[in-house]
């Protein structure tokens, strides 16, 4: 089944956002379109932007005036950016970053008032959950590049990414309990990224943790000085982009598939995946290149 079909079935300013340089803006029909139901007026700027270069797509949360709140419009725009050409061999890795001093403050509380109604509230949370599932089930790795606060659903977004790199000035919180809205959906991703007692302390108190604490508990992959954030994130992205897309894609899918299984089932599934990997053109190319003491030439073909 095509990757997009599978995905759909699951129903810091300046250099920190990688928007400068020779990044190729995605087609206007993609970048400027308003996802169905997003509720954004045509005159309003798109809440995310996306550019792609050398197999690396950078998606930027672009509403710093509202602390990059994950409004319904923002979520649908982010979903569109993530799903765009997911099956293309030209796409090797995705980076999600943000403009301004806040990565994301979480849901837009103005959308969660009584006036909006239960159906609208359900759409907000269901759309957010779909975005997180799209990240998990996407055929390429997704990297969060964090410079600043990631709170509530913003913290959920970081926890949902495959890799997360943050500046040492960043912090992470699930503070919904302080305004009477427990961070139940952020808790799903958080509980799968950090130990249970750490997750529950964050959820029960709403108190933030530092980048170093987040690294210690497994929410982050790396913490670097702010000046080195883009360089280190791009180093990781370029390394992934230099590898075989189908091999990496199979590896990602297999990793998450085996994760909830018992030990025996996990080894059975991964053994089958290793056999499938060897049947890939790039699987044989890599081994042949190693034996011939040369660099592999990846085809990036799925068979």
UniProtKB/Swiss-Prot annotation:
GO terms for cellular component: mitochondrion. One of its GO terms (biological process) is fatty acid metabolic process. GO terms for molecular function: enoyl-CoA hydratase activity; hydro-lyase activity. Its main location: mitochondrion. The keyword Repeat does not apply. It is found in: Mitochondrion. Disulfide bonds: none annotated. Belongs to the enoyl-CoA hydratase/isomerase family. This is Enoyl-CoA hydratase domain-containing protein 3, mitochondrial. The gene is ECHDC3.
């Amino acid at each position: 089944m095509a990757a997009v079909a599978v995905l759909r079935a699951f129903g810091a300013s300046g250099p920190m956002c990688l928007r400068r340089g020779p990044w190729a803006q995605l087609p206007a029909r993609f970048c400027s379109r308003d996802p169905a139901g997003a509720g954004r007026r045509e005159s309003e700027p798109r809440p995310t932007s996306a550019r792609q270069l050398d197999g690396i797509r950078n998606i930027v949360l672009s509403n710093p005036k509202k602390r990059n709140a994950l409004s319904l419009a923002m979520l649908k725009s982010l979903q569109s950016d993530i799903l765009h050409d997911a099956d293309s061999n030209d796409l090797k890795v995705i980076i999600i970053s943000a403009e301004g001093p806040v990565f994301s403050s979480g849901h837009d509380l103005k959308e969660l008032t009584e006036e909006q109604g239960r159906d609208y509230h359900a759409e907000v949370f269901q759309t957010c959950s779909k975005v997180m599932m799209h990240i998990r089930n996407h055929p390429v790795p997704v990297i969060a590049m964090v410079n600043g606060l990631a709170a509530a659903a913003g913290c959920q977004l970081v926890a949902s990414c495959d890799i997360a790199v943050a500046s040492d000035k960043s912090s992470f919180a699930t503070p919904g309990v302080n305004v009477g809205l427990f961070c139940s959906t952020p808790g799903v991703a958080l509980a799968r990224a950090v130990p249970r007692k750490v997750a529950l302390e964050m959820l029960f108190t709403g108190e933030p943790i530092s980048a170093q604490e987040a690294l210690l508990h497994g929410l982050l992959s790396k913490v670097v000085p702010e000046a080195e954030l883009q360089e280190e994130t791009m180093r990781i992205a370029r390394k992934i982009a230099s590898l075989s897309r189908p091999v990496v894609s199979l590896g990602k899918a297999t990793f998450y598939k085996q994760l909830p299984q018992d030990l025996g089932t996990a080894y059975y599934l991964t053994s089958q995946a290793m056999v499938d990997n060897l049947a890939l053109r790039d699987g044989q190319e890599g081994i042949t290149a190693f034996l011939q003491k040369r660099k592999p030439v990846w085809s990036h073909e799925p068979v």
